[in-house]
From Swiss-Prot:
Keyword Ribonucleoprotein: no
Protein name according to UniProt: Imidazoleglycerol-phosphate dehydratase
Gene expressing this chain: hisB
Species lineage: Bacteria, Pseudomonadati, Pseudomonadota, Alphaproteobacteria, Hyphomicrobiales
Species name: Rhodopseudomonas palustris (strain BisB18)
PROSITE patterns: IGP_DEHYDRATASE_1, IGP_DEHYDRATASE_2
Signal peptide: none
Length: 197
């Protein structure tokens, strides 16, 4: 079973995340941030990864700590669930359309955390959610999942559509990259014999 549960508690947030990489896309998300919950629901649905997130944070200040800390915990959960990464497909990429928006997302489950994020949002907020937090979440996730992740919105006019295309794009590449490659015979997909470093 490729599952993991991460609990993270700081003075700012208390978070519990559970993932099942071989799930059906079921989700149970409660962060107290409506738009963010919507994005995480999409992530679960389109990745086919079961995701449970329970987060209590200092939302009376702003959404930054909760958003970032959920990214940290979810990244850690995915990394833990992958184990030694034997047999995974490892690489995946997609061009993901969302109406007038087109975003390219490419992933390498490399064990070498890197984020290249190029998306410009026409507005500073989507509802009450600061659009700059989209990048913050992706950075926290990539650094803690140990993945190389490139996210680039090629064009788009609607901030909601841009954010949604980024999350859906990540979902689809995660789905492909964590999948077991039947031809790999359980081998780690690296000439080094291990991933990371």
């Amino acid at each position: 079973m490729r599952t993991a549960t991460i609990k993270r508690k700081t003075k700012e947030t208390a978070i519990e995340v559970t993932v099942d990489l071989d799930g059906t896309g079921a989700s149970n998300i409660a962060t107290g941030i409506g738009f963010f919950d919507h994005m995480l629901d999409l992530l679960a649905r389109h990745s086919r990864i079961d995701i449970t997130v329970k987060a209590v944070g200092d939302l009376h200040i702003d959404y930054h700590h909760t958003t970032e800390d959920v990214g940290i915990a979810l990244g850690q959960a995915v990394k833990q669930a992958l184990g030694n990464m034997a047999g995974i497909t490892r690489y995946a990429g997609i061009h993901l359309p969302m109406d007038e928006t087109l975003t390219r997302v490419v992933i390498d489950i490399s064990g070498r955390p890197t984020l290249v994020f190029k998306a410009e949002f026409p507005r500073d907020k989507i509802g009450e959610f600061d659009t700059e937090l989209v990048r913050e979440w992706f950075n926290a996730f990539a650094m803690n999942a140990g993945v190389t992740l490139h996210v680039e919105t090629l064009y788009g006019e609607n901030s909601h559509h841009i954010a949604e295309s980024c999350f859906k794009g990540l979902a689809r590449v995660l789905r492909a990259a964590v999948a077991i490659d039947p031809s790999a015979a359980g081998e780690v997909p690296s000439t080094k014999g291990q991933l990371g470093g």
